[in-house]
């Protein structure tokens, strides 16, 4: 007997909002993994997107590209007005599919609640990536929608996917009335490209920091810790990959610490990121909180030793392959960093541990785990 095909509708919300980012990466990988799976029909009404992850995926190179070749090829010509118009078209197409009710399960990609008015009695599975807005409200004063919208969706969802045990614990700590039985943990993975032969203008010896540097990422704290280490090692640099140019606060502190000549900010392509990791003495991730922490996996997959806080989801991701410091303890971080920089054998040990740990995570596992939860929700 043939198994009944499961029809899953994914909303285009995150692909409209993000040009790149962890959430759109997650849904691109899930969508791509399930798209050609037997017994599964996945639909995401995405008539147009500027999302880089989607454009680099097999989804873009097949039906998406063929159906929208004109828009893709000529969007630069119409750049001033076309994206907004096409995103509205995405929304209209999405609403029409919701109203048609020809699906078994709905998967929202973020926390907009508008779909609820059209959903009827159809089940939906919500992924919760973190509880940053709830735990650090001082950093999101202008965002008045995310917290109440997320709460509403968590209460109404058939199932909730949390991307770490840490995130699940945070959900239940903040909202103890939510049924713990409907929350299941599914780990993410990484999509790091293999290091290429591209020649990058990077120093011979450097510590690596990757991504956003604001607020709970603890970059200012890290700058103060790394400053004396840089001064004691004139041939050592700090490379900040991504995150845009240093802001006024960062630049002022760099000037005051007198370490301008040993700090570089570099923007990168996805195809270059592995080179940054592989060339580094170590990767430092001083963040106070992450729902998961994909950069930790990326670094380990590239054989780059990782120093990170013993907090949040990090022990779940790095396991015994991480070198942990006590959160916000400057002396502890400084000691761990010096130990690693001064000991080649220790770096080699954690390089190998990291490769083994990173190999435990892949998007196929993530997609299969999500699909099992989707099936249980119908």
Residues covered by each model-derived region:
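Carbohydrate transferase catalytic cores enriched for Leloir-type hexosyltransferases
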Residues: 1-378
């Amino acid at each position: 007997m043939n198994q009944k095909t499961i029809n899953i509708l994914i909303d285009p919300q995150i692909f409209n909002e993000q040009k790149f980012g962890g959430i759109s990466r997650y849904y691109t990988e899930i969508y791509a993994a399930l798209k050609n799976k037997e017994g599964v029909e996945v639909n995401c009404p995405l008539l147009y997107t500027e999302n880089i992850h989607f454009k680099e995926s097999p989804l873009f190179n097949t039906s998406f590209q063929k159906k929208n070749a004109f828009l893709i090829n000529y969007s630069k010509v119409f750049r001033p007005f076309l994206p907004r118009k096409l995103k509205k078209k995405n929304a209209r197409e999405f609403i029409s599919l919701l109203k048609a009710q020809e699906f078994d399960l709905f998967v929202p990609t973020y926390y907009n609640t508008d779909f609820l008015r059209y959903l009827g009695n159809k089940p939906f599975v919500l992924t919760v990536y973190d509880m940053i807005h709830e735990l650090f409200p001082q950093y999101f004063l202008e965002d008045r929608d995310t917290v109440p919208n997320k709460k509403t969706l968590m209460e109404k969802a058939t199932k909730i996917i949390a991307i770490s045990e840490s995130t699940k614990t945070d959900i239940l700590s903040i909202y103890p009335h939510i049924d713990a039985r409907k929350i299941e943990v599914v780990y993410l993975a990484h999509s790091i490209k293999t290091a290429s032969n591209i020649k990058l203008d990077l120093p011979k010896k450097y510590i690596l920091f990757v991504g956003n540097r604001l607020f709970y990422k603890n970059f200012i704290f890290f700058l103060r810790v790394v400053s004396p280490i840089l001064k004691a090692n004139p041939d050592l640099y700090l490379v900040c990959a991504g995150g845009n140019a240093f802001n006024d606060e960062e630049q002022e502190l760099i000037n005051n610490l007198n370490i301008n000549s040993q700090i570089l900010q570099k923007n990168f392509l996805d195809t270059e990121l592995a080179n940054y990791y592989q060339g580094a003495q170590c990767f430092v991730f001083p963040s106070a909180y992450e729902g998961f922490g994909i950069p930790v996996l990326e670094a380990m997959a590239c054989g780059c030793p990782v120093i990170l806080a013993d907090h949040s989801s990090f022990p779940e991701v790095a396991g015994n392959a991480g070198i942990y410091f006590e959160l916000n303890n400057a002396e502890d971080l400084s000691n761990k960093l010096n130990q690693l920089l001064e000991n080649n054998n220790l770096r080699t040990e954690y390089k190998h541990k990291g490769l083994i740990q990173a190999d435990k995570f892949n998007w196929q596992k993530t997609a299969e785990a999500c699909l099992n939860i989707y099936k249980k929700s119908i």
